[in-house]
Design a protein with these regions (language model features):
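C-terminal catalytic and target-recognition region of SAM-dependent MTase-like enzymes
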Residues: 298-403
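Short beta-strand/turn micro-motifs composed of small residues
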Residues: 20, 270, 350
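A short, flexible beta-alpha/helix-coil linker loop
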Residues: 110-113, 169-170, 316-320
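Conserved S-adenosyl-L-methionine
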Residues: 185-304, 319, 327
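Flexible, glycine-/basic-rich loop-and-beta segments that form/coincide
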Residues: 58, 63, 169-174, 178, ...
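Non-catalytic nucleic-acid substrate-recognition regions in nucleic-acid-modifying enzymes
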Residues: 5-147, 400-405
Length: 405
């Protein structure tokens, strides 16, 4: 069921659509609402909201859990190719695109008169170019790699919605990684895990399977309120005809001025010296090496410097392990948490439900997410001591013996 959230403010000027991952819609909506978005509507893998141009700039620069932000510019019904062409021709693309600018078209169609999405894009391209030729006696050029504006076309049946992409390159590309681990967690998803976990930057955070340290880096940026796009060079809206550079500089300066201190530490470790070396280089360039402490270490040897602490890990999913090895691996993770992280909270994301049956701990919460195409669950575990710990341990022993041989 869709949820609508309202803020009583001055009437907003423009509707926007923020695209995100399944399961992150609520935290993306919270981020946008805190920035001043109004009429926030949670959709499937997206959030609709209203705001002015300053909010559009700020959302692109600061939102951690958004992949891209679209500005709808037209919607219409059609029953033929000719009608589709005429409706696209009417759209005032010149408000956003210079006559000598560049553009590209992306189409998604379902149950449509079009045989394929490429034909819809081609027809829309012709309509746009013909409009410019009629108005200016010239036409913009197609650039599929680095266009000034990227036009998104959504066709369902006889309905068409058209939007332009204000983000340019996907917002998960923060600009802080010089090298990327082949299986690195998406930055937007990593930030989403941090926000979903409920960590308030009021204690240490630990990722003892950090790989390229995406979770520690995103946690550190959140902890000091560093804008998610702090290291990006540009955004799509900067190439629009109505781009306001002074407004952008104001938005950027105001956001940068909110960067604060973090009195705790974020620890990341991994058994791969190569991953840690690359992560250290990125973190040093970001000037976060006073916050993020990295080490080459097996997870069995990790102990928190102080408790309580928060743990967020993305363990191996077991593609290259047999079932017995994987079950023992997950059992060992659970044992480390029980023995070394009393009074702490741990979160684990994995698609492997069978392996989690051997974890030896009962989750207090589960959140369904996707990591790329993999359907995952984000499990919350709370570690206790004393009578409550003993009670849980007894239950966990029965739980483990039932599922693990």
């Amino acid at each position: 069921m869709q949820k609508r959230r309202h803020l009583i403010m001055n009437a907003p000027r423009t509707k926007y659509i923020a695209k995100t991952f399944f399961g992150l819609e609520s935290v993306a909506a919270d981020e946008l609402q805190k920035m001043g978005a109004t009429d926030v509507l949670i959709l499937n893998r997206a959030v609709e909201f209203w705001g002015d141009k300053a909010l559009l700039y700020k959302a692109n620069y600061c939102c951690r859990t958004v992949l891209r932000i679209l500005q709808p510019i037209a919607s219409f019904l059609f029953t033929s190719n000719e009608q589709f062409y005429r409706n696209v021709f009417k759209i005032p693309f010149e408000h956003y695109l210079f006559k000598d600018g560049t553009f590209c078209m992306h189409s998604i169609i379902s149950n449509s008169i079009f045989d394929n999405s490429q034909y819809a894009s081609l027809l829309a391209k012709d309509a746009l170019c013909d409009r410019f030729r009629e108005k200016y006696n010239c036409r913009p050029s197609v650039d599929k790699n680095y266009p000034d504006i990227s036009v998104d076309i959504y066709v369902s049946g006889d309905s068409c919605s058209i939007a332009i992409d204000s983000s340019g390159e996907s917002l998960h590309r923060r600009g802080y990684k010089t090298t990327r681990h082949f299986a690195a967690l998406n930055e937007v998803l990593a930030a989403g895990l941090v926000l979903l976990s409920g960590w308030k930057a009021d204690c240490d955070l630990i990722d003892f399977m950090c790989g390229s340290a995406t979770i520690p880096i995103e946690a550190a940026m959140y902890a000091i309120n560093m804008p998610a796009g702090y290291f990006r060079k540009d955004f799509g809206f900067m190439f629009w005809r109505d781009y306001d550079e002074k407004l952008w500089q104001k938005v950027q300066t105001e956001a940068d001025n909110t960067i604060t201190n973090f009195p705790f530490k974020i620890y990341g470790s991994d058994i791969s010296a190569k991953f840690i070396k690359n992560a250290r280089e990125n973190i040093k360039k970001m000037k976060l090496d006073n916050i993020i402490m990295l080490s080459v270490e097996s997870f069995e040897d990790v102990k928190p410097e102080r408790v309580p602490a928060y743990v967020i890990i993305n363990p191996p999913y077991g593609e290259r392990m047999n079932n017995e090895i994987l079950e023992n691996f997950y059992l060992n993770i659970g044992n480390v948490l029980k023995q070394n992280f009393i009074h702490s909270v741990a979160w684990v994301i994995t698609p492997n439900k069978d392996a989690m049956k051997c974890f030896g701990l009962r989750p207090s919460k589960k959140i369904h997410l996707f990591n790329a195409a993999l359907e995952c669950t984000f499990y919350k575990f709370e570690m206790y001591e004393g009578s409550k710990k003993n009670k849980n341990n007894k239950e966990n022993r029965n739980y483990t013996l039932h599922y693990c041989k």
